[in-house]
């Protein structure tokens, strides 16, 4: 008997309601009297819809990322890669930014579970981290699909989802033995750019019939760093290129079908990521390195992250509805050479001694989904989450020494605690109501309690309305939040500057920046409205969005007091307001049915402004257009052409710190485009080849020390891959 699928037909309702699970926001259930399989909804109908984008395994195979999944996620509507501020520091460590809200407001999930390893990396005075982010823990070949959720629907996922949610879903075990071995290489034409080589395997099958199945995969990857002199010299030093990375991953999943309707998953993962240093110093000032240490470290490993996770997940189907529960543990050891915490040498390696910060996270979730008919067909979701994070970072919390007397803070580092923790408990409910045929109303409410700032309410309302057979309008509004991170709220976290790094409003003296345990959460009111068109495979849509942001946590400008030597005492504080506003558009044209398709999306940023400073929240293109022409030439061979156009990028216009007064660089990055071609050939049933050229016309962007040119856009490169299945 074939399983009967339970579908929610509208993309927004499916994304929000689906299985209604924060641990898997677009899941679907298949069941019959003999078996139950809980899996994700990678339905083609969801692709390129307002607020929801789906990247399938086939999409990844046709345009494989060089190493990091962010490279393909960035091609979704509303998504870019950027730093967490407009400062430009750590410019080549760009992370996923959704709707201009910054990487810290993008919640990354793997199989529905939050990933927080990047939070083990020190948070700088300017709001940046020396991290690659959390989108590189799963090799591309092991991904079943990636779901990108934008807009008000993200409110149900709690802290850190003000921009949106990225859910990376891995391949499930199968009831028959299968395996694969994949090899991939990427070779740049410019010998100053780093090459990449990757190998991984996947093995899955039954251990005891279909009652007990397993999946095991492993991955090893090496990306070389850019040459130390890839960027032109400025002020006696080079802006660093992209650093290299070595990845090693092992992941195991054991799935126990207790009954046909009850499944328990046991999971374990271990990863090691080590960098290959390219010379970045946060402020591109390697000429200030003590004893030329930065220069001697090029090509060496200066930081490495060890990540381990354990998980236990339960899924059940009952006569009355569905249930899900899970407990998870994540431990990250972040080991790196000691870095400065003072002024222009903040973030610069200043020692050959390694220190380790440890971040441990415990999580538990539970929810039920109750379908019923009272006045209208509806499904009510009730759930809870408990999260506890502990950070132990002696190198950051106990680095700054001062002879000044600071209220409540010891000048002796050994007297300051290296630890900080936070507990966040949330409960939520959501009701997916089909008020009339073609009308779905989805009210929601989430309540969170934080051990420091107390309570927070996050209401949301989403609407989907059919307008005849071809058009549909969707709208939503939600209040979303982000809790202070464990550096901002730590009383032991102390940074200092001799004066040049003080806020521009402070004319004299040096400054100390203290942690603040009394911070309130950041708040954003997210709104969107969109119109969709569907007819005979043709699909088009346009969405307007606006996020009104307040209480953004920033390094303080208000002087709390002065030390005996006249130094100014500041602390992390809740700032004023900001606004992000823009348009997203999508278009799908089946040029020749089942043979040739043309898919395009576009993002246009109307406004991105911190109302306190007048500067943008982050440096992103004014507009981005992604287009793909996909041709299924034969049943075995497919080819594609992809093109991305980036609009101009403007840097900050207004000085924020003292040494920028009158000398702030305003050089822009003009619009430019990147074209790629690729092909896939199924040579035999168990042998697949792919190859292509990225950046076909060799458009390169070189990083500069200041302005909007904060990153390297790599030039033409040739890639090839092979996958052997058995």
Language-model segment annotations:
Residues 69-72, 94-97, 109, 133-136, ...:
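N-terminal periplasmic accessory domains that precede
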Residues 114-150:
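Short acidic/polar hinge/loop motifs at secondary-structure boundaries
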Residues 116-121, 549-550, 555, 645-656, ...:
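C-terminal beta-signal and adjacent terminal beta-strands/loops
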Residues 355, 361-370, 416-420, 426, ...:
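Outer membrane beta-barrel strand-and-loop segments of large Gram-negative receptors
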Residues 26-62, 103, 111:
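Short, acidic, small-residue-rich periplasmic hinge/interaction motif at the N-terminus
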Residues 182, 434-438, 544-549, 560-655, ...:
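Gram-negative outer-membrane beta-barrel transporters
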Residues 174-297, 551, 648:
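Periplasmic-side early beta-strands and strand-to-turn transitions of outer-membrane beta-barrels
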Residues 70-117:
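Extracytoplasmic beta-strand/coil segments of soluble accessory domains associated
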